[in-house]
Amino acid sequence: MQTGAIDAPKRLEDLHVRRDLVASLLLRTLAFSDQLSGAALETRLGLPFETLLPIIEEFQKTQLMDTLGFSNEPAVEGRPIPVRMNYTVSSAGRQRAAEMSSVQTRYLGPCPVNFEDYLSLVRSQVTGKANVTDSALKKALGTLELEQHVIDQIGGAMVSRASLFIFGAPGNGKSTITERMALLMGAPIEIPHAVSIGDEIIRVIDPVYHKIAEGEQPIDRRLVKVERPVVVAGGELKLQQLDLTYDASNRYYEAPLQWKANAGVFVIDDFGRQEVPPMRLLNRFIVPMEKKVDYLDLSASGRKIELPFLCQVVFSTNLSPTELVDEAFLRRMAYKIGVGNPSPEAFGRILRYECDRQGVAFDEKAIGYLLNNLYGKKPLRGSHPRALIARLVDLANYRQEPPKLSPQTLKEAFDACFNPALGSLTEDDWARPAIN
């Protein structure tokens, strides 16, 4: 798979990366591995052998590298002779690699992509409006019970890739909505393992957020084809995670969360529960959301870079909006979506689905018993049926009997989920934000 935004390199000059950085990466990789075939060097550095050959020849002339005969790896069969050779560093080469590691970056991995080339790549992957339809969105949402006007607003936000503020009581599907949005983000994207700005390296790929896409990978092995990322940051989010993180020991940077979310979705979950006050967190995003660019500092050199801010930002909270945000915040959110409690009818449909999913015979009378005898004025939640049926099945397994819906089993499951001793902790429609 050839990327359309940047060309796979054929010569060293095509990398647009400093020659001494590539030389250092090559020598340190070989010193760390003792010996590698030409094909293995291609794999480790993500580069065609032809791009490395000028540096290898230079290292051989200066006696920093030696050859150890032909490799017997199956992958080298039929390849040119230099690719089939095994390479190692000499004692002088090992000393030179150690000197490089002591003063230069210690990054090891595929060769970084030039930052300007990366900008072309990411911009090519976020163009125009997203192709999201009502039927496709409903299919992605699956069995999640939402009113049509809520679905319409989610669709509008996705088509425009606009900022989104989702609020509502816990347990009604806010997190599920953001997860399902990923299914409609569009075709997979290509991202580099790392990028370089001069002699500074920033690691971009993160296996936590970047899921390898199915199918053929790019010819350019500096890149990886991944599903569009959904980066979720919860109550643990700190402002430092939105800046480049410099590893002083290994002398390279880790990309911040919003960079890793580029061309995807960045979700601020549990908004209002972070240590940083909500308005201060919002202020960090005002310029990026409005200008579509973010400014980041390379702390080791003092340089500043301008990064395209091409992720869709979603703020999600189960705290009371009236006590959490102000008019200025809401003005900057393109879409404000309240996810309410399910109606009794929707609650019944969810209960039926959970019974089918968990292998319990459904009884229509169970809905009336739950609503009239157990819930009373207690607010319904979309997550309750799953928990109730799971507890019912647990207790049936404990008694070694088949699970069934009855007043007794429903009452036991209800008490397990909502022990009366918890009082208002299980009844408050809205939680209050922490005081920062």
Language-model features and meaning:
Residues 45-61:
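Short amphipathic alpha-helical interaction segments
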Residues 138-312:
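Conserved ASCE/P-loop NTPase catalytic core
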Residues 351-414:
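Conserved AAA+ ATPase small/helical "lid" subdomain
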Residues 122-151, 377-379:
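Dynamic helix-loop-helix/coil hinge segments at AAA+ ATPase domain boundaries and subdomain interfaces
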